Amino acid sequence: MKPIAIIGGGITGLTAAFELEQLGVSTTLFEAADRVGGVIQTVRDGEFLAEYGPNTILETSPLIGDLVRDLGLEDRRIYSSEQAEKRYIVRNKRPVKLPGSPLEFLLTPLFSYRAKARLLLEPFIRRAPSEMEESLASFVKRRIGREFLDYAINPFVAGIYSGAPENLSVREAFPRLYALEQRYGSLILGQILGARERRRKGGVSRKNAPKFSFDEGLETLIQSLGEKLKKNIRTGQTIIGITRQNGSWKVKSDTDTRRPDEEYSGVLLALPAFRLAELQVTCESRKVNLSMLSRIEYAPVASVVLGFHRKDVEHHLDGFGALNPEVEKLHSLGTIFSSSLFPGRAPDGQVLLTSYIGGLRAPHLVTKTPDEICALVIEDLRVILDVRGEPTFKRTCFYPRAIPQYDVGYGRFKQFMTSLEQNESGLFFAGHCRDGVSLGDSIVSGHEAAGRIAANLNIST
């Protein structure tokens, strides 16, 4: 059997390659950069351990735990501390704990009494027609009011998509929220009844899903996959075209001319949308144009990782982190209390904070110099967390096109990729522009793509 070509060496492509190899399907993985792993980057500097990209994996699917087990990493996996369940939202420039129970909700200063009273009307608001596509902002204002948009949804959207609720499609970006209204006619009733159904089926919600990393950070996962697949990986290979002729596929690289005639039984494209749009695809002498995918917008983000002496931070840092609503007029999108999540992230007597800046809220900030960006983040931290003194550790990383935006109308892009899979034999798509933007989503996407490829090859999974 001819191997499968996998284009893209992020976590999706790596997962797909590993799962296919487990099924006895040989693969060749092509990655344009000189390393695999994409945005997952962990840096060890002395006793500081910094994550430039994601900080945690949310274990929303058993497939994620299966991958960890199959790689033999269970002994190195560490779950977040109990206090990480606590989250803060900034209001009036101060972090306020997000309520975790009905009583806390009634007492919280995060929302006004008027907003709380408005919430009581939510079960009586009619559901929108199923064929209607609505922005997240419109959906939230209609069902629970403007204040919840400003002080709950807006900051969480910044934390997940670095995007704008006014642009995001509730159906595409938050399908579970959309499904609650469509199935139960109410978000509140849906949460109650949905929780009962999950308990009965043994399922877990994203809110209650455990969060984990590894003793040496998330790049542990990448290193393990890279080691298992090292004979299959070709880094520094930018694929500029793929061709199917007489049922077999060939790939064309801008640099590698060693094996131009190597044939594959299928191709998995695990690339960001802007790279897919540039790819030249030919199927049995027919040009397949992917340029429409260039219209998918990506949010630019810079991550800023700072260490401070514990005595120089007044806040207890007893939680996952703090998110900054846009109405608060701060520079940064939010801050993760990295050293509170997992042990071994900072030296004794010091703390590590990871902040994010830019997004569609302020894309111009990502163009500033590292020193300028650090200064803006530190300015925010002095206000929000009462940080004093100067940082003992400082790192900045830029992602000009970090996160795809599942905006209103995004369904046409997903349908386009699905249609090509169905109509072009041996061509497959996976990754964050198709199956969700979280790290867990990307792992599941790679696993499921491997399953589709195996089914296409008539291999039992």
State where each predicted segment sits.
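N-terminal Rossmann-like FAD-binding beta1-loop-alpha1 element of flavoenzymes
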Residues: 2-29, 454
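Conserved Rossmann-like nucleotide-cofactor binding loop
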Residues: 12, 35, 274
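Glycine-rich FAD pyrophosphate-binding loop
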Residues: 21-45
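Mid-domain catalytic core of redox enzymes
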Residues: 23, 235-353, 360-367, 371, ...
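Dinucleotide-binding Rossmann-like beta1-alpha1 core, especially the glycine-rich loop
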Residues: 46-128
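Short, well-ordered coil/turn residues at beta-beta hairpins
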Residues: 60, 142-143, 270-271
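Conserved flavin/dinucleotide-binding core of flavoenzymes
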Residues: 99-102, 248, 317-319, 333-461
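Active-site/ligand-binding neighborhood in enzyme catalytic cores
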Residues: 117-241
